[in-house]
């Protein structure tokens, strides 16, 4: 048996080690020295011994007074294990590796006790049982119980109670062999478990007192049982301790060191033992020796051992010899010999740790539920959570107090030994040598039993089954008695400890009561109990950290009484002889009764001991909420669970350790598992608010109280009779349950019971299960025992449900009230961690053996599984949670009630799972035991059930896919910067004081800022300039919302090197009362570098740059043209490097394998490399300046440099920037860079024009950096107004009286990037369709000539215009789309929208994305494209599908032209309006031409209306297409374009020209142009182009010039095609079709053609159809354009659409440019004289549609001039200067200057230039920044891929679902397409079907209203038309 037990012990040791330290080996090593002492508590089988040993060690450590002894194993260990809690959590744990923590230090801090306890939990559980008697003896001389809990790491334990306990224990301990053991174990126990020794002593004494041999069989059994329970609890504590960095049990304890010393002494080796060096006097009790042996076998060698192997053969041999001799002695004197036995156990390989655990358990009274001061102090000293400290304290106390109950035997070595022997006898029967087992029984047997029980309880089962049989027979009558008997049994069998660990609050109390009874029964039950309670209180306090741990332990104690009876029957009894069993039963009955009473009193006392009973109550309630409703045990377990989770995780790290010390964790897991089960059955997850446990508790409490009273009465009446009766009840249920458990899994049984009983039943079941488990632990049935040991509570709970519910509840009522209260308080205090100690301890009490078993059995990983079968695991975990309850019927009831209570409250307990930066907090834990055995957190493989809400709540992470987890594991976004707070104001109000941040610098005064900057910059005096600014919160801006400046801060002299703007925070006088908001280094980079950069960047970017569309480029209304109207010269912004992407939520290159950070248009690797070199070099040079001037911000930006170096600019280390934006004459409206790094800054390097590089000289045109919300202070930095006035006089500060700027605005609001993208998509889609249809375009072209004739017929509308429209070929658009031309500019004008998108995308830029989307909008006339002849005839117009204009106008050309041309693309102006707009656009240039074009178009389209105006207007009706074109129209010019379109639009020309020419007199066209021109200010042509689908006409007219200019401008923005708009000039001018074609070719050639593309497609859309007609030469262009994707609808709206696009392009730089370009091209094609000039000019002024004005013929020039005159409005923003509080502080950056500001927090802007020209910019701002979330390696490619996988998976799931539901996913995509391309789609059908056109014709003919015109789906589709409607 000894060998078997030693085997178990070693097995246990690993478990214990695991609990102490994740590194099993390390723990094993540590345990060699530490375990001996511990094994006295554990291995001894009697807790007393272990406790004594521990006590000894503790004293030694305390003697060391926190000085490393240097000789213990931990001290000798040089490197951390890397597996323990402290090593694993090095970042948060400030404690030394558990493996390296000096035993003495641990003892002093009680941490060793933790560690020992953890070890002892498993090892000491059994050993402690035997050692308890020894401890008693030892405690006499030394406080072995808990008085020295402080030394035991349970320092927080209440010292008062400890002292009381010590006294009581001392008084008790002296009795009998306690002295003997005291001499032996006391040295060890006191040194190691000085605190626990005392409690153990009383227990031992009690056991010892009673242990007359007959009684002391029972007493011994009781002691053993209780010791085992205590050991379990202790093991849980130890586990918790190990998890929390408590000394590993394996660390050499003082006992171990004494053994080492003695070994060295006897072997004449160099004594490396502790200075204590009482080698000869070293405790040699069997438990201690066995513990030491187990440790030694696990690699714990004497400190000075020189053996090479992992073990010291000599030492092992010596220990074996000692153990043999000790066993002999133990056999000789079963009780007195217990201490010796513990020594022998240690010697005989009984791990001292186990012995110590047993002793500790004995030393730890069950009553110490509440956390004590020791726990608090421990938490502080150990820097661990209070929960952990409580757990440790509880374990410590349990090891001493609970074992104390067992200590009855343990305290007296012989008696505990006998008890242990009885237990061992029963266990040993299985194991072999009962006597050897007796020493081992408590510890080793307990451990073995745990492992065996879990594994099958082979060794223990054999003896257990007999004992259980006899015991059960005896006990069946009285289940309670049986439980009491199992108390010893629990000590001997780890099953009982499991119950003890499992016991929940009430159960715990019951266990305490039972413990008290046991204590009394052995000797003076009440006295012993009181003594135990004293220590127990301390320990319980400690344990109370985790009510589960302690409660379980306590419950186990009580339940041990109850369950011990059962357990004794099952385990101890089986091992014990019948006499011993009987004795134990009798003793247990009396003892239990007394113990219950004492425990109740003690509990009351304990509750008072709590720091805050209310808080504790709240905590307890919380825990209960958190705890599973099944049993309060579970709550306890859950309390333990939380710590267990951590521990389990850590244990998982070292599975071996997991096996050894996971017991506490598995119990908690078991508890969790049961909780889920209970929750499942009892709505565990119900919201805490919904869970009303009070009623349930009240009922249960009443029942429990009644039951307790009954039990107490029965106990008081008869030790056995009452106990037997209660036990018989409990036993009946518990045994039945046990039997069931034997056959059925504990979980199953428990679940069944719980399901049937509800929460209360569940609780009872848990208790019963725990009880039955306890019995089972003693039972020989392997599975049963295993289940019992793992989930003894579960079985007990089942039994309890059957029989013990009532009695258990009775006890529970009292215990429940008190214990629950305590638990609640504790929970409130510690939350879920509270469960840790309780769970742990209880689980170890009940699962101590299970732990071992767990180590042996994978199921043990599951909280309960280790002891339970897979099924049993679930139920038993509950029981396990409340082993004490399980042991006691009352305990069962209590446990059940507690569980129920806890279950209801359990929701308050939270489960925290974290993966990477994501932490999932759930209120419950539904874990299958399998899951819990692994992590305490279910894993996918461990999912106990199908995915459910409860399952997800239980462990959300387990339901995540690996890709999702990988995403989750990615670092979370950095939290927003937290800046220093102050007490100056109640709450910082940034609205009043301005943004608050300090990373640029701050100080209490302005003078401090000067000092700060002088220190940073290295110069003083005039070199540093401080300017105070005042935050007003009133933004200075023009009436149109554009930036203005009221004060300009300039560099005063060469001496001034650095200028800082500081803000005094209103109402602040703190250290951050003044903050720096801007730093300007006037000489940031060398002058030469600045000069070269200016020229290089200008040349490269102007040619190849790809403008970036930025929202800040426009005012709020998106109608300003602050960047300039000429797409060729307008200001633009170019982005390089890495920047943040909303799509990726990280770097925009996330999916780029080979990102081009300096991407230029086309394939220009050399240019890109050139830019790369320049910017990288500049970033490298700017970074040091940034670091010098703003070190904190710099550091913030380089934090993640190493990780995300791919997203950084710079050639040297120290790369704060990720990207750079080059702003060339770009006016940035007031904005904040919201996506910048939250605690970083932007660094702006300014390069200025040659005329602005001299200090003191103010250039004609300059750009200022403005802070719109600030005003300049009236005083200088020194508070002097005179000084400020002097600065103003010298020019340092320029005070402006006005800020005159030309008011430039777009015809219509520019589209957002999103809109443009959508439009582009639509346009692209339409374009494709049109292209397919346009295969017929040649015919159209032929027809277009006819149309052209018609257009010619209309002198007002030149055919050329139509041709230009034709020229606006989709190909051109496509080319422009390709950015053949200077796409950058045009795209910019389009704001990149047009250009990036298809020509159609250009169209998309326009409101009428369908038309714009299809430059073939003429396709709207698309009918034309389809119908080579202007099928516009269907409008009743001749094939002059100029009729489209008419039909667009729906017959009311006049009305529409006037309305539409005039101003309302949206209104769908009449042809006249359009014509007027066109005329205006063309100005005087070709009013006639425009009309002619209009007339031509109308004729061409429909001869019907010689009054081209109407036709033209109709064309403008077609304009609706342009209106679609309005996507281009989106551009400010959009409306204008519309207006112009009637006159100029090539598309309109075919239709409108005929109409407009006829209906519109040149005057009308002119007026249209004129109206357009005003809008042209932003882009006259664009406007006209936009407004006129027929715009070609208007564009061809004078509008052509101005319109082209505008168009070009927009085109430039939108696309280089705008430049080609200049080509469109020919449009205005009469240009042969060939010429037009050439123009078109030119425009295509230009990148900006993209805008034109839209133009050709947009403008020509109708022309496309009309192309054949192409209104003459324009027809060709139109054909091409139509071939370009011009949707039929677009064609329908052709004239308008085309010119609309064109116009729009100019007006909407980003969106309209293509259109404008097309229009321009069309116009160029048009033989308009102005068109010709325009053509020339357009090519020249391609970027400046407005420049077309200059290039246009006089007529056009005039019209353009008119347009300009109208648009050339200047504003001085007077109102801003009338209010002093309106802000507008500007800084005039110098050449090479570096400006640093927090752009993310401060509103900033740059003023518009009078004449922006990015080709020769007045200022180039190189803005270096770091966007947020650019912290992933390789641009976040891995994250992106993971995301894609996730999306793909989702898509797959959706597909499967769709397939399952029979839904076609295509429908969704189609729907989406319809959404964005609905118009296009609609248009496309018209394009495809002439019928559609006829329908339109009919509509058009029938009605003049836009609505009628748009009766077609096209109208709706063209969205833009809706405007007109």
Curated annotation (Swiss-Prot):
Its cofactor is Fe(2+); Zn(2+). Detected in embryo (at protein level). Detected in embryonic head, in developing brain, neural tube and eye. The lineage of its organism: Eukaryota, Metazoa, Chordata, Craniata, Vertebrata. InterPro entries: 2OGFeDO_JBP1/TET_oxygenase_dom (IPR024779), TET1/2/3 (IPR040175), TET_oxygenase (IPR046942), Znf_CXXC (IPR002857). Residues 465-476, 841-856, 883-892, 1350-1363, 1502-1513, 1556-1572, 1730-1742 have a biased composition (Polar residues). Binds target DNA that contains at least one unmethylated cytosine via the CXXC-type zinc-finger domain. Zn(2+) 4 binds at residues 1042, 1120, 1122. Disruption phenotype: Morpholino knockdown of both tet3-a and tet3-b causes defects in embryonic development, including malformations of the eye (eyeless), small head, and missing pigmentation along the lateral body, leading to embryonic death between stages 35 and 40. One of its GO terms (cellular component) is chromosome. Zn(2+) 1 binds at residues 69, 72, 75, 102, 1068. 2-oxoglutarate binds at residues 1110, 1223, 1265, 1819-1821. Residues 457-476, 630-685, 774-812, 833-892, 1307-1364, 1474-1513, 1556-1600, 1722-1769 are annotated as: Disordered. Keywords: Chromatin regulator, Chromosome, Coiled coil, Developmental protein, Dioxygenase, DNA-binding, Iron, Metal-binding, Nucleus, Oxidoreductase, Zinc, Zinc-finger. Binds 1 Fe(2+) ion per subunit. Disulfide bonds: none annotated. This is Methylcytosine dioxygenase tet3-A. Residues 1837-1870 form a coiled coil. Residues 1316-1347, 1490-1499 have a biased composition (Basic and acidic residues). Residues 777-797 have a biased composition (Low complexity). It catalyses: a 5-methyl-2'-deoxycytidine in DNA + 2-oxoglutarate + O2 = a 5-hydroxymethyl-2'-deoxycytidine in DNA + succinate + CO2; a 5-hydroxymethyl-2'-deoxycytidine in DNA + 2-oxoglutarate + O2 = a 5-formyl-2'-deoxycytidine in DNA + succinate + CO2 + H2O; a 5-formyl-2'-deoxycytidine in DNA + 2-oxoglutarate + O2 = a 5-carboxyl-2'-deoxycytidine in DNA + succinate + CO2 + H(+). Zn(2+) 2 binds at residues 81, 84, 87, 97, 1229. One of its GO terms (molecular function) is zinc ion binding.
């Amino acid at each position: 048996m000894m060998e078997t037990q030693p085997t178990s012990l070693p097995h246990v040791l690993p478990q214990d080690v695991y609990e102490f330290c994740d590194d099993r080996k390390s723990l094993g090593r540590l345990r060699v020295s530490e375990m001996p002492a511990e094994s006295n508590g554990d291995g001894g089988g009697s807790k007393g011994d272990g406790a004594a040993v521990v006590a000894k060690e503790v004293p030694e450590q305390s003697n060391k007074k926190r000085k490393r002894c240097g000789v213990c194993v931990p001290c000798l260990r040089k490197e951390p294990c890397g597996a323990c809690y402290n090593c694993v959590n090095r970042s948060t744990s400030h404690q030394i590796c558990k493996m390296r923590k000096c035993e003495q230090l641990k003892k002093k801090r009680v941490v060793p006790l933790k560690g020992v306890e953890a070890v002892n939990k498993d090892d000491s559980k059994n050993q402690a049982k035997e050692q308890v008697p020894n401890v008693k003896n030892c405690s006499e001389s030394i406080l072995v119980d808990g008085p020295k809990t402080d030394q035991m790491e349970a320092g927080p334990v209440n010292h008062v109670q400890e002292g009381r306990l010590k006294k009581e224990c001392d008084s008790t301990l002296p009795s009998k062999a306690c002295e003997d053991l005291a001499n032996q174990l006391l040295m060890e126990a006191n040194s190691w478990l000085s605190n626990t020794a005392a409690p153990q002593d009383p227990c031992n004494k009690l056991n010892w007192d009673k242990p007359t041999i007959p009684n002391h069989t029972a007493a011994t059994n009781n002691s053993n049982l209780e010791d085992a329970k205590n050991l379990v609890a202790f093991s849980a504590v130890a586990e918790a301790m190990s998890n929390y960095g408590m000394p590993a049990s394996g660390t050499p304890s003082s006992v171990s060191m004494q053994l080492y010393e003695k070994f060295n002494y006897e072997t004449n080796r160099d004594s490396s033992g502790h200075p204590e060096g009482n080698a000869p006097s070293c405790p040699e009790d069997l438990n201690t020796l066995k513990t030491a042996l187990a440790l030694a076998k696990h690699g714990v060698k004497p400190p000075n051992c020189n053996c090479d192997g992992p073990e010291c053969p000599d030492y092992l041999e010596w220990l074996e010899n000692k153990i043999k001799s000790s066993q002999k002695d133990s056999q000789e004197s079963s009780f007195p010999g217990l201490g010796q036995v513990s020594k022998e156990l240690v010697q005989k390989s009984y791990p001292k740790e186990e012995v110590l655990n047993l002793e500790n358990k004995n030393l730890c009274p069950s009553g110490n539920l509440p956390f004590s001061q020791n726990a608090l102090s421990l938490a502080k000293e150990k820097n661990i959570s209070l929960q952990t400290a409580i757990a440790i304290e509880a374990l410590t106390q349990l090891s001493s107090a609970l074992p104390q109950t067992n200590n009855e035997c343990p305290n007296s070595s012989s008696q505990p030994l006998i008890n242990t022997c009885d237990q061992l006898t029963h266990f040993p029967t299985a194991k072999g040598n009962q006597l050897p087992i007796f020493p081992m029984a408590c510890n080793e047997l307990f451990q073995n039993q745990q492992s065996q029980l879990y594994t099958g309880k082979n060794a223990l089962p054999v003896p257990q089954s007999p004992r259980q049989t006899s015991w059960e027979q005896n006990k069946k009558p009285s289940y309670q008695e049986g439980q009491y008997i199992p108390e010893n049994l629990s000590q001997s069998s780890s099953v009982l400890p499991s119950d003890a660990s499992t016991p929940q609050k009430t159960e715990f109390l019951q266990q305490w009561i039972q413990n008290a009874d046991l204590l009394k029964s052995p000797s003076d039950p009440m006295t012993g109990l009181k003594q135990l309670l004293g220590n127990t209180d301390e320990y319980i306090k400690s344990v109370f950290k985790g009510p589960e741990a302690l409660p379980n332990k306590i419950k186990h104690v009580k339940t041990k009484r109850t369950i011990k009876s059962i357990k004794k029957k099952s385990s101890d009894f089986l091992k014990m002889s019948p006499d011993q069993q009987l004795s134990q039963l009798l003793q247990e009955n009396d003892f239990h009764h007394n113990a219950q009473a004492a425990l109740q009193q003690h509990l009351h006392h304990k509750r008072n001991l709590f720091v805050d009973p209310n808080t504790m109550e709240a905590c307890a309630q919380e825990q209960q909420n958190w705890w599973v409703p099944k049993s309060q045990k579970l709550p306890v377990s859950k309390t333990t669970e939380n710590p267990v989770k951590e521990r389990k995780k850590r244990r998982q790290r070292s599975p071996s350790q997991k096996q050894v010390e996971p017991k506490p964790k598995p119990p908690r897991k078991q508890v969790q598992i049961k909780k889920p089960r209970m929750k499942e059955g009892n709505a565990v997850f119900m919201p805490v608010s919904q869970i009303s446990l009070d009623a349930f508790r009240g009922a249960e409490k009443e029942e429990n109280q009644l039951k307790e009273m009954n039990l107490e009465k029965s106990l008081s009446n008869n030790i056995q009779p009452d106990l037997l009766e209660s036990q018989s009840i409990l036993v009946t249920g518990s045994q039945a349950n046990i039997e069931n458990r034997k056959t059925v899994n504990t979980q199953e049984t428990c679940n069944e019971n719980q399901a049937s009983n509800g929460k209360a039943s569940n609780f009872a079941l848990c208790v019963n299960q725990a009880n039955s488990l306890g019995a089972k632990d003693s039972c020989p049935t392997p599975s049963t025992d295993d289940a019992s040991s793992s989930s003894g509570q579960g079985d007990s709970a089942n039994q309890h449900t059957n029989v013990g519910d009532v009695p258990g509840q009775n006890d529970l009522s009292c215990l429940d009230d008190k214990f629950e209260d305590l638990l609640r308080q504790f929970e409130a205090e510690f939350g879920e961690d509270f469960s840790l100690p309780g769970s742990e301890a209880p689980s170890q009490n009940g699962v101590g053996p299970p732990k071992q078993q767990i180590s042996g059995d994978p199921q043990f990983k599951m909280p309960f599984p280790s002891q339970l079968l897979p099924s049993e695991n679930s139920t038993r975990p509950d029981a396990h949670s409340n082993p004490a309850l399980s042991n006691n019927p009352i305990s069962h009831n209590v446990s059940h009630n507690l569980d129920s209570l806890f279950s209801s409250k359990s929701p308050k307990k939270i489960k925290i799972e974290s993966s990477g930066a994501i932490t999932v907090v759930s209120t419950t834990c539904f874990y299958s035991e399998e899951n819990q055995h692994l992590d305490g957190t279910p894993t996918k493989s461990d999912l106990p059930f199908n995915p459910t809400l409860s399952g997800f709540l239980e462990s959300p992470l387990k339901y995540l896919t690996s890709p999702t987890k990988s995403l989750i594991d990615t670092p979370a976004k950095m939290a927003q910067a937290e800046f220093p707070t102050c007490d100056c104001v109640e709450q910082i109000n940034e609205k009043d004081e301005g943004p608050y941040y300090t990373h640029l610098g701050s100080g209490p005064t302005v003078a401090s800022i000067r000092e700060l900057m002088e220190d940073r910059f290295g110069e003083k005096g005039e070199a540093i300039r401080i300017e105070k600014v005042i935050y007003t919160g009133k933004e200075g801006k023009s009436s149109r919302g554009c930036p203005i400046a009221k004060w300009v801060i300039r560099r005063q002299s060469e001496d001034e090197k650095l200028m800082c703007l500081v803000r005094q925070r209103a109402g602040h006088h703190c250290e951050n009362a003044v903050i720096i908001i801007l730093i300007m280094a006037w000489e940031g980079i060398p002058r030469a570098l600045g000069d070269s950069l200016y020229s290089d960047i200008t040349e490269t970017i102007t040619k190849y740059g790809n403008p970036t569309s930025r929202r800040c480029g426009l005012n709020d209304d998106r109608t300003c043209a602050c960047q300039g109207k000429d797409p060729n010269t307008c200001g633009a912004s170019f982005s390089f490097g890495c920047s943040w992407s909303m799509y990726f939520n990280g770097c925009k290159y996330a999916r780029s394998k080979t990102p081009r950070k300096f991407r230029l248009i086309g394939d220009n690797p050399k240019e890109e490399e050139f830019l790369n070199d320049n910017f990288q070099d500049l970033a490298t040079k700017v970074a040091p300046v940034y670091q010098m001037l703003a070190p904190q911000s710099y550091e913030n930006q380089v934090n993640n440099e190493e990780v995300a170096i791919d997203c950084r600019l710079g050639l040297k280390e120290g790369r704060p920037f990720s990207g750079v934006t080059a702003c060339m004459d770009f006016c940035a409206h007031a904005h904040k860079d919201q996506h910048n790094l939250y605690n970083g800054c932007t660094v702006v390097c300014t390069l200025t024009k040659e005329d602005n590089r001299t200090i003191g000289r103010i250039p004609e045109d300059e750009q200022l950096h403005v802070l719109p919300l600030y005003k300049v202070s009236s005083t200088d930095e020194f508070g002097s107004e005179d000084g400020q006035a002097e600065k103003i006089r010298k020019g340092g500060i320029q005070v402006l009286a006005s800020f005159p700027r030309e008011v430039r605005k777009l015809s219509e609001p520019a589209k957002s990037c999103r809109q443009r993208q959508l439009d582009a998509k639509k346009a692209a889609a339409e374009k494709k369709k049109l292209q397919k249809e346009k295969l017929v375009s040649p015919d159209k072209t032929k027809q277009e000539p006819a149309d052209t004739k018609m257009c010619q017929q209309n002198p007002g509308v030149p055919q050329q215009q139509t041709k230009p429209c034709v020229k606006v070929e989709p190909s051109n658009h496509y080319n422009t789309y390709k950015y053949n031309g200077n796409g950058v500019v045009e795209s910019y004008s389009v704001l990149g929208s047009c250009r990036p998108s298809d020509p159609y995308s250009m169209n998309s830029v326009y409101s009428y994305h369908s038309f714009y989307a299809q430059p073939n909008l003429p396709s709207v006339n698309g009918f034309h494209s389809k119908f080579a002849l202007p099928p516009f005839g269907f409008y009743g117009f001749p094939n002059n599908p100029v009729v489209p204009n008419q039909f667009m106008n729906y017959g009311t050309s006049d009305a529409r032209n006037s309305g539409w041309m005039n101003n309302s693309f949206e209104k769908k102006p009449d042809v006249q309006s359009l014509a007027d707009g066109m005329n205006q656009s063309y100005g005087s240039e070709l009013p006639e031409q425009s009309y002619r074009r209009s007339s031509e178009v109308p004729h061409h389209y429909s001869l019907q209306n010689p009054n081209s105006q109407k036709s033209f207007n109709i064309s403008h009706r077609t304009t609706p297409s342009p209106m679609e074109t309005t996507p281009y129209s989106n551009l400010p010019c959009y409306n204008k374009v519309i207006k112009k379109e009637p006159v100029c639009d090539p598309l309109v020309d075919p239709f409108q020209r005929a109409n407009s020419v006829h209906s519109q007199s040149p005057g009308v066209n002119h007026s249209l142009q004129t109206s357009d021109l005003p809008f042209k200010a932003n882009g006259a042509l664009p406007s006209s182009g936009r407004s006129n689908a027929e715009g070609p006409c208007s564009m061809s007219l004078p509008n052509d010039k101005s319109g082209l200019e505008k168009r070009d401008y927009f085109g430039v923005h939108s696309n280089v095609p705008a430049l080609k708009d200049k080509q469109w000039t020919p449009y205005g001018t009469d240009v042969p079709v060939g010429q037009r074609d050439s123009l078109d070719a030119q425009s295509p050639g230009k990148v900006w053609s993209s805008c034109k593309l839209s133009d050709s497609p947009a403008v020509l859309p109708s022309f496309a159809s009309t192309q054949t007609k192409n209104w003459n030469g324009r027809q060709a262009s139109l054909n091409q354009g139509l071939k370009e994707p011009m949707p039929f609808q677009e064609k329908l709206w052709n004239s308008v659409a085309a010119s609309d696009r064109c116009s729009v392009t100019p007006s909407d730089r980003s969106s309209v440019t293509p259109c404008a370009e097309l229009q321009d091209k069309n116009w160029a094609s048009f033989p308009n004289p102005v068109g010709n000039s325009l053509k020339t000019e357009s090519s020249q002024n391609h970027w400046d549609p407005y420049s077309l004005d200059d290039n246009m013929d006089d007529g056009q020039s005039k019209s353009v001039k008119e347009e300009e005159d109208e648009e050339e409005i200047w504003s001085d923003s007077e109102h801003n200067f009338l209010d002093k509080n309106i802000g507008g502080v500007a800084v005039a950056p110098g050449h090479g200057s570096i400006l640093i500001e927090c752009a993310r927090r401060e509103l900033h802007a740059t003023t518009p230039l009078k004449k922006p020209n990015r080709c020769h910019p007045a200022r180039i701002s190189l803005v270096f920044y770091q966007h947020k979330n650019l912290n992933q390696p390789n641009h976040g490619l891995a994250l992106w891929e993971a995301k894609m996988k996730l999306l793909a998976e989702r898509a797959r799931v959706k597909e499967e679902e769709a397939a399952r539901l029979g839904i076609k996913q295509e429908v969704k995509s189609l729907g989406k397409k319809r959404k964005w391309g609905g118009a296009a789609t609609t248009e496309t059908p018209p394009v495809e079907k002439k019928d559609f056109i006829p329908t339109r014709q009919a509509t058009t003919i029938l009605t003049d209203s836009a609505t009628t015109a748009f009766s077609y789906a096209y109208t709706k589709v063209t969205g833009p038309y809706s405007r007109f409607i």
